[in-house]
Amino acid sequence: MTTDALTALLPFIVLSAAAVAVMLAIAIRRSFRLVFWLTVGGLLAGLSTLPHASSVAPLQVTDLLRVDAYGLFFHALFLLAALVVALLCLAYFRRRENENEEIFVLLLTSTLGALLLVSSAHLAMFFLGLEVLTISLFPMIAYSVRASRPLEAGIKYLMLSGLASSFLMFGMAMVYGDLGVLSFEQIGAHGAELEQKPLALAGLFLILAAIGFKLSLVPFHLWTPDVYQGAPTPVTAFLATVSKASVFALLLRFFTAAHAERSETFLCVLGLLAVVSILAGNLLALLQVSLKRLLAYSSIAHMGYLLTGFVAAGLLRRDLQTETIAFYLAAYTVTSLTAFGAISALSDDDRESDRLSDYAGLFWRSPWLAAVLTLSLLSLAGIPLTVGFVGKFYVFAVGVQAETWPLVATVVIGSGIGIYYYLRVVLTMIQPAGVGQRVTLHPAAGTALAAAALVILAAGLFPQPLIDAAANVPQPPPTADSPQRLTATGGLP
């Protein structure tokens, strides 16, 4: 293996070494704080390797793995998100007796799976990366073994993930049986004839069904509210951000390589999934009295917004499609981390602060925490001066440019419904204070929330740096198309 290849693989090597180091530390001497600092050190070391990997990118390291600026953008996003989740885990799990340090090993391995997933260039690596991510998530979801709800959530996720993996493997087999290839590039070479390849087209739809499960797209969403509610809140934060963002980034890489935009049937299916996900997610969120379930249904709607941007921008220019998805995923990730981080900070030793009634009078008990949660909800709603508004503006703008009017109308209707249930939570927090203890915020959780809230505000008020970063992410695979962008003002088979 060449020096350039080793340099490109540095983020994966460092994260793998960090996971092994944490396991050895646990085996030698159990210390929650030591393991936490090893995890943070591993994530920071992974971040420090990204400039070195970028210096040799783009590079096809093997037939399975491609390291390029597209993947490295999401590597940075996922490592930063995992760092925030590690801080939330320190504050959340150290308050609970008999909670062991293995949560940090699982956090590192699941993050490694996300990095592998977004850098996949072959369906085999797609499957391997997805399984590394998913298998690490099973015990994370069921981690609080003393409670029945996390265990139930873990079993549900395990069973339905197995079904999704079956769809994925069967779809891969059908694609290989019809085309004789599994690499994204070689599948793309058959893109013009996919409509005349019914077996391969059916295989792609099965792969889409597996991806739809991971993204909670309707009708593959039924696991989402129960798992979000049952999992420990820091794990829910990871599941809602890194897990979903990595799968969507892979969706963009795979289906653009396969030239799916040439298939009218495929675009119609994606558009239909976007419409029903937006409407179902928002309407079901109206009925919730649990904040975590409300955010679960909200996440379904946000995946629909992302699909809208995927379809509409893909009809215009590929580089605009990448810019739209990259910006929206970054905005959604930081906003969701803030919302779930606030819920995690409010949870006590005995139970999660999950019911809306738990937030009554929060503004009077903890004004700062209420302000952070309010900011995250306003960003999810797409209110101006937040990063969520800029992300939703991207989706709306590309929809108008592409003249996909049914999708644009659905985004407007869904956003209007979303404003109602997000503001319902805000109004609950400013009700007169009842009986309730003042909230004591752990320094780790406070640091994570302060940083995330600052990003929401800064990127909402001054979005151009993040827009530039998203615009500089090349389309996977690179194209020769001239750039069009939005600005703040406008070997194996």
UniProtKB/Swiss-Prot annotation:
InterPro entries: NADH-Q_OxRdtase_suN/2, ND/Mrp_TM. Pfam families: Proton_antipo_M (PF00361). Its EC number is 7.1.1.-. HAMAP family: NDH1_NuoN_1 (MF_00445). It is a multi-pass membrane protein. It catalyses: a quinone + NADH + 5 H(+)(in) = a quinol + NAD(+) + 4 H(+)(out). It is an enzyme of class 7 (translocase). The keyword Coiled coil does not apply. This is NADH-quinone oxidoreductase subunit N. It comes from the Bacteria. GO terms for cellular component: plasma membrane. NDH-1 is composed of 14 different subunits. Subunits NuoA, H, J, K, L, M, N constitute the membrane sector of the complex. GO terms for molecular function: NADH dehydrogenase (ubiquinone) activity; NADH:ubiquinone reductase (non-electrogenic) activity; quinone binding.
